Regions:
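Oxidoreductase cofactor-interface core, primarily capturing Rossmann-like NAD(P)-dependent enzymes
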Residues: 2-39, 50-53, 60-62, 71-78, ...
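Cofactor-binding loops of NAD(P)H-dependent oxidoreductases
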Residues: 45-47
């Protein structure tokens, strides 16, 4: 059984569908089961990262867990990161953590802190460090359609955005195939945008 946290989010919904279509037993961990829309045949479980007992219950009995951590500050993550790591480690599940490319350069970021907590406590882990999500550029559509210029704080920055379904495909592979244990992968899109 594979537990997908953030199962109704940008990546999670694609991952649940991907695993379900491969006839993998998948459990969707969601904050509010009454509002969650999951494919027929997929079980959901209530989980809120602010309630450690719910996290422990959600991952109990899992063979693998896709772990998604909200973008909190590094200090907020540091407060509970060790507890989360211990819960995931005690479950005995393989863990794939969706991190960010920035974790490598920012050791005090929430991503780096959570990576460290998982690596310290979980026997079998994989880290996916993503660049920007492609869907985030949709916020520019109204601005562009109105004839305006999109302004970016770093005018010469080049980004390689990745579609959320592609992240889900990579996550599914790491959750199913044990050859990815102990690996860190940086996931990027097919081309760089300036």
């Amino acid at each position: 059984m594979i537990v997908v946290t953030g199962a109704t989010g940008s990546v999670g919904q694609h991952l649940v569908q991907n695993l379900h279509s491969q006839q993998v037993e998948v459990v969707a961990a969601v904050r509010d089961q009454t509002r969650a829309s999951v494919p027929e045949g997929v079980r959901s479980v209530a989980m809120d990262v602010e309630n450690l007992a719910s996290v422990e219950k959600a991952v109990a009995g899992a063979d693998a867990v896709f772990w998604l951590w909200p973008s909190l500050s590094g200090s907020e993550t540091a407060e509970v990161g060790g507890d989360i790591g211990r819960i995931l480690g005690a479950s005995g599940a393989r863990v794939t953590y969706l991190s960010a490319e920035a974790a490598a350069a920012e050791p005090t970021s929430s991503w780096a802190i959570m990576e460290n907590a998982i690596e310290q406590a979980v026997a079998e882990w994989t880290i996916l460090r993503c660049t920007g999500f492609a869907k985030n550029v949709r916020m520019w559509i109204p601005q562009i359609q109105s004839g305006d210029t999109v302004r970016w704080p770093f005018a010469n920055a080049i980004r390689s955005l990745i579609h959320e379904a592609d992240i889900a495909d990579a996550a599914a592979a790491t959750l199913i195939d044990k050859t990815h244990i102990g690996q860190r992968y940086t996931l990027t899109g097919p081309s760089a945008l300036r």
